[in-house]
Design a protein with these regions (language model features):
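Switch/communication elements of ASCE P-loop NTPase nucleotide-binding domains
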Residues: 53-171, 188-192, 335-339
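Generic amphipathic alpha-helical segments used as scaffolds and interaction surfaces in large
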Residues: 9-20, 101, 122, 212, ...
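Acidic, divalent-metal-binding catalytic cores of TOPRIM
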Residues: 132, 137, 141-340
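Short N-terminal helix-initiation segments at or just after the protein's N-terminus
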Residues: 3-4, 36-39, 67, 85, ...
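Residue-level recognition of the N-termini of beta-strands and the immediately preceding loop/turn
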Residues: 40-42, 91, 204-208
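Extended helical coiled-coil dimerization/tether regions that scaffold
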Residues: 1-69, 74, 81-89
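Generic solvent-exposed, charged/amphipathic alpha-helical segments
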Residues: 26-31, 111, 192-196
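Catalytic cores of large soluble enzymes that bind and process phosphate-bearing ligands
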Residues: 14-17, 21, 71, 99-102, ...
Length: 340
């Protein structure tokens, strides 16, 4: 910061003045007999070099020395300083994982800072969903085993979606090799347990990631999946009483991709995840005591996440998992995702 804010001429003047002041200070100590060297052949000496001066100065923010600031504040200060004092000779700026030690709000400040036009080529290495999405998915380059890949030909609306969306799953999705996409909290809460019941292993043990997205966002993720032939993605979705319109026709453009599958119940009467669960396990669930409500299916539809949590607890603590029937469309999706 010091070197970026001082001219060469003034820098020389500062160095000269620092040497004079150092010598005068040492002379004063001896004159006032505050420093007694007792006739030793060695005498105390100040290091009046520029490095010594630079080591002795610091910066202050709101009255607090930067040495006492948190690591997050130091990251912001470092990036801000780098951006504010780019010289004409600088052509490339490299920033490695600037998100380290940052709170959510400071990460937002960082994203706004990085979005500014610097006039130079900026490379940012990151594992942050927010940085990757807010700076534009079309600007991303993925490094994997020495190979570089880029998302080409994305719809402009898809780019804007990830820049503005509150959902921060972009890197989780793009870096995963086998992805199960589900609609909401209820499906997300139960899907890992269903996977474990089918494969006797947790998803992460088989390199599978489960990501919850808004059902209206599936196509945004599938557009990215279509760019990666080595990434398997299965969507588990409701038919909402119209399998042909809401599933078959809606996702017909992705049928050509061998790495993409959309799975839903074919029966229009089984319009939601909760109804499929209930119809496959009516007697078991009615006798489970999961709720005092006499209308269990109605409760499942009203309190989706709460019911999912209660069911998960029963599946993990009781023996009902051996009797529990996972709907076929979910079972098929979970089996498909690990096939080579």
């Amino acid at each position: 910061m010091y070197l970026d804010n001082i001219s060469a001429e003034n820098r020389a003047k500062v160095n000269h003045q620092y040497r004079i002041n150092s010598l005068n200070f040492l002379h004063t100590l001896r004159k006032d007999e505050l420093l007694k060297e007792n006739g030793s052949e060695f005498q105390l000496h100040f290091d009046e070099s520029e490095n010594s001066f630079r080591d002795s100065i610091s910066a202050v923010k709101n009255g607090v020395d930067i040495k006492n600031l948190g690591q997050g504040e130091k990251v912001l200060l470092g990036v801000e300083n780098a951006y504010s004092h780019l010289k004409e000779t600088v052509k490339i700026l490299l920033i490695e994982e600037p998100e380290n030690h940052l709170s959510f709000q400071n990460l937002q400040k960082l994203v706004n800072m990085l979005s500014s036009n610097t006039g130079v080529q900026v490379f940012i290495g990151t594992h942050s969903n927010m940085i990757a999405s807010r700076l534009g998915v079309d600007n991303l380059h993925f490094l994997d085993n020495g190979q570089i890949s880029k998302l080409e030909g994305l719809n402009r609306d898809t780019i804007r979606f990830f820049q503005k969306s509150t959902n921060q799953n972009l890197l989780n999705f793009t870096l995963g090799k086998k992805i199960i996409l589900v609609e909401g909290n209820a499906e997300y809460i139960l899907m890992e347990k269903f996977f474990e019941m089918i494969h006797s292993k947790k998803p992460e043990d088989l390199n599978v990631s489960i990501i919850s997205v808004d059902g209206l966002s599936f196509e945004r993720y599938l557009e990215i999946a279509a760019c990666f032939v080595d990434k398997k993605v299965v969507v588990i979705t409701d038919n909402d009483s119209d399998y042909v319109g809401n599933v078959q026709s809606k996702y017909s453009s992705y049928q050509q991709f061998q790495n993409i599958k959309v799975s839903s119940d074919l029966d229009n009467d089984n319009q939601t995840f909760e109804i499929c669960i209930y119809k496959n396990n009516k007697a078991l669930l009615d006798s489970s005591g999961l709720t005092k409500s006499k209308d269990l299916q109605g409760y499942m539809l009203r309190e989706k996440a709460e019911f999912a949590l209660r069911l998960l607890e029963h599946l993990e603590t009781d023996n009902i998992s051996k009797k529990f029937i996972i709907p076929n469309y979910i079972k098929e999706a979970i089996e498909w995702i690990i096939k080579d």
